[in-house]
Amino acid sequence: MKRNRILALGLTMITACSLLSGCTSTSTDSSASSESTEAAATSTSSDEQVVIYSNADDEAITAMSNALDNNGYEGKYIFETFGTSELGGKLLAEGTNLEADMVTMSTFYLKSAQEQNNMFLSLTFDVDTLEEVPDYTAPITSQEGAIIINTELLEENNLPTPTCLKDLTDSVYAGYLAVTDVKSSSTAWLLLQALISEYGEDEAQEILSKIYENAGDHIESSGSAPLKLCEDGEVAVGFGLRHQAVAAKEEGLPIDYVDPTEGNFSLTESVAVLDKGDDTNEMAMEMAECIIKNGREELQSYYPNALYEGESLDSTNKSAYPKTFSEDLTFELYEHHQEISEAAKP
């Protein structure tokens, strides 16, 4: 879900930024020096290393790297991260010619890439998820949408607390609202799914048009930007990822979150292993299993939604209106909903 790229060998790295857009590439290794990085790359040939492409945020990269490093794979893989749209485009265009041996990516993109290119292997390890998933995917994270509010600004400006997304069409929020453009961030798709599911496409477009009008210049390209703007006191209301708002509130910031009555829709990111025939890197399947078996505890500390049997969710992190869109989430549906969003723009 980010635009930056990182290169990691061995121990986990943390990227230079956490936004979903435009960052400078960064590389680190376990010894934190460029000389050591070059030495590590030289001593371990690229043929032996598993190349992992990912759209994940910093926290997820950290958790996955920790799982691999702590279970014998230090120095045996390379992580490279991309924005969701960029990596999705590579999957669809390149198929099995992709340089990567393994990807972690928005599941809806993986589905479309598999249908178009038949590029992923069936996983050879047990994936005991709470809900049925394609046999070539194992989910690593689930992220829900919610309304985010700055409690101090609401009070200072006598603004009502919204209870649903349709409330955001009220002109009282003009100049106080930030949302994300679905053309640049899949986070915004959570808002689109909720509106379309509740009101149908035509009314959803009308509602979205009024929301965009109230947001004005704050139709952001980054999914985390509305929360950041709320934290900085630049806007009073935003739409973003629920777990990030929960964390901000727990840190003592004047941030709260509202589960919209239209529903808390979610997107998952999953791991998949590329099928390259005789050139398939066998260690990629081992690493995929390692991430799921040894990384989920840390992953769930950042992305609390339960995905696997035996996992639980505390009351704070349990949304009030969890819902699933009526149609299967695919890149093609994402494109269609982007068209609705474009038509709604001023």
How would you name each of these model-derived features?
Residues L19-A39:
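Bacterial lipoprotein signal-peptidase II cleavage site
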Residues D47-I78, K249:
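Short, polar/charged alpha-helical segment
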Residues L130, V172, Y176-K183, I207-Y212, I219-E220, E251-D275, C290-S312:
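Periplasmic-binding protein-like
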Residues I148-L153, T268-T280, L299-Y302:
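A bilobed periplasmic-binding-protein/Venus flytrap-type ligand-binding module shared by bacterial periplasmic
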Residues L313-P346:
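Extracellular/periplasmic bilobal clamshell ligand-binding domains
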